[in-house]
From Swiss-Prot:
This is Bifunctional protein GlmU. It catalyses: alpha-D-glucosamine 1-phosphate + acetyl-CoA = N-acetyl-alpha-D-glucosamine 1-phosphate + CoA + H(+); N-acetyl-alpha-D-glucosamine 1-phosphate + UTP + H(+) = UDP-N-acetyl-alpha-D-glucosamine + diphosphate. Its cofactor is Mg(2+). One of its GO terms (molecular function) is glucosamine-1-phosphate N-acetyltransferase activity. It is found in: Cytoplasm. One of its GO terms (cellular component) is cytoplasm. Residues 1-229 are annotated as: Pyrophosphorylase.
Length: 456
């Protein structure tokens, strides 16, 4: 096992022609984040002292999307093979460190597998990640003599007997910095593709009498690459199945694991139940006995014990105290807070608003830039009119206020505790004390009026 410091090279220069996209291939999303970010995250599990990202097509898009100052950006102006890509990064290799080579379009690689690779790398030699495939077509074959790895032959350069070999090269390897620089300087492009293959360093190492040790990944799918959208969609389902399995084994009840997407991280308590077609994004924390209904989307939110989220609700950057209920068809936008026992019903939207303990907004309301006290009833059709075309203003509603249906509150405005607002009222000024507030005109009846008739 190598105990030397380590740096990483991630190859991410490919255009991804078969994606039929203007976006660089490695920026296409898997589980809500770019494929290459998954690889960076895995590399960082090994405490790499430097992560070199070799880029080419769409470099500015990459730099903008990743926005990571700790990355060392290495330009590969021409894509002349994996060996050529590593040659561009070689000036950054320290002689006394190990270099781990990864790929930006192999997103399921894990820190666990990479530590396994570290464990087998011999001093002065190469650690190589390989897998056995029933159908190895298209992959470089591992050449062994007396059981020891001596080389890799690419598909287009292989003889018929070599094509029958089932052990293939994943492209992921670990080698010493000084050795790797020396081997890279000896690469040629004398092959069917006219490219510089990184795989040729295996034969060079063997010629020097260096030991090459191969190891398999924890899961074969970790080394699957993405060249088209079908492969990306396939790996998405592989990833989601793995996440669902982990959650089920940790006590979360997923009603249908095949219809659940985790695009981030999920912390959870005991006896959490999640129905079908739920999407979790960013970092979400669910307390004990939380129930999430079908079709909900929850992002970067904390939902405390005993909350019930009914179907088709969308919750983003929100905080829910215990015993709250939301939905169905509710939307909690960033900055929404529900105190203990609060209820937000169907077709209610909140944004930068706090609903106090035991307060209820049952249906068909918009509550934006609002501070609402405890035990408040928000009637159907209530709107906090918070925007004048330029500025956002705040509405403050005290404890025990009853807001009748079809009420508009023109912010900035405050309503004192205990006020009752009659249905159909427009609140334009502060209400300073408890009582009934209303501003509608007397009801009129025109008995002679006749409804218009359609012409026949």
């Amino acid at each position: 096992m190598s105990n030397r410091p380590m740096s990483v090279v991630i190859l991410a220069a490919g255009k991804g022609t078969r994606m039929y996209s203007d976006l660089p291939k490695v920026l296409h999303l898997l589980a809500g984040k770019p494929m290459v970010q998954h690889v960076i995250d895995a590399a960082r599990e090994l405490n790499a002292q430097r992560v070199n990202l070799v880029y080419g097509h769409g470099g500015e898009l990459l730099k903008t999307a990743l926005d990571d100052r700790s990355l060392n950006w290495v330009l590969q102006a021409e894509q002349l093979g994996t060996g050529h890509a590593m040659q561009q990064a070689a000036p950054y290799f320290a002689d006394d460190e190990d270099i781990l080579m990864l790929y930006g379009d192999v997103p399921l690689i894990t820190g666990e597998t990479l530590r396994r690779l570290q464990a087998v790398k011999p001093d002065g030699g190469i650690g190589l990640l390989t897998v056995n495939l029933a159908n190895p077509t298209g992959y470089g074959r591992i050449i062994r003599e007396n059981g020891r790895v001596v080389g890799i032959i690419e598909q287009k350069d292989a003889a018929p007997e070599q094509l029958a070999i089932g052990e293939i090269n994943t492209g992921i390897l670990l080698a010493g910095g000084a050795d790797l620089k020396r081997w890279l300087s000896k690469l040629t492009n004398n092959n069917a593709q006219g490219e510089y293959y990184i795989t040729d360093i295996i034969a060079l190492a063997h010629q020097e009498g260096r030991q090459i040790e191969a190891v398999h990944p924890v899961r074969t799918t970790e080394t699957d690459g993405v060249n088209n959208r079908l492969q990306l969609a396939t790996l998405e389902r592989v990833y989601q199945a793995e996440q669902a399995e982990k959650l089920l084994l940790s006590g979360v009840m997923l009603q249908d694991p095949a219809r659940f997407d985790l695009r981030g991280t999920l912390e959870h308590g005991r006896d959490v139940v999640i129905d079908t077609n739920v999407i979790i994004e960013g970092h979400v924390k669910l307390g004990n006995r939380v129930k999430i209904g079908s079709g909900c989307v929850i992002k970067n939110s904390v939902i405390a014990d005993d909350c019930i989220i009914s179907p088709y609700s969308v919750i983003e950057d929100a905080q829910l105290a215990p015993d709250c209920s939301v939905g169905p068809f509710a939307r909690l936008r960033p900055g929404s807070e529900l105190a203990e026992g609060a209820h937000v019903g169907n077709f209610v939207e909140m944004k930068k608003a706090r609903l106090g303990k035991g307060s209820k907004a049952g249906h068909l309301s918009y509550l934006g830039d609002a501070e609402i006290g405890a035990n408040v009833n928000i009637g159907a059709g209530t709107i906090t009119c918070n925007y004048d075309g330029v500025n956002k203003s705040k509405t403050i509603i005290g404890d025990d206020v009853f807001v009748g249906s079809d009420t508009q509150l023109i912010a900035p405005v405050s309503v004192a505790a205990g006020v009752t607002i009659a249905a159909g009222t427009t609140i334009m000024r502060n209400v300073p004390a408890a009582g009934l507030v209303y501003n509608r005109k007397e009801q009129q009846l025109n008995a002679s009026w006749q409804r218009p008739q359609k012409k026949k």
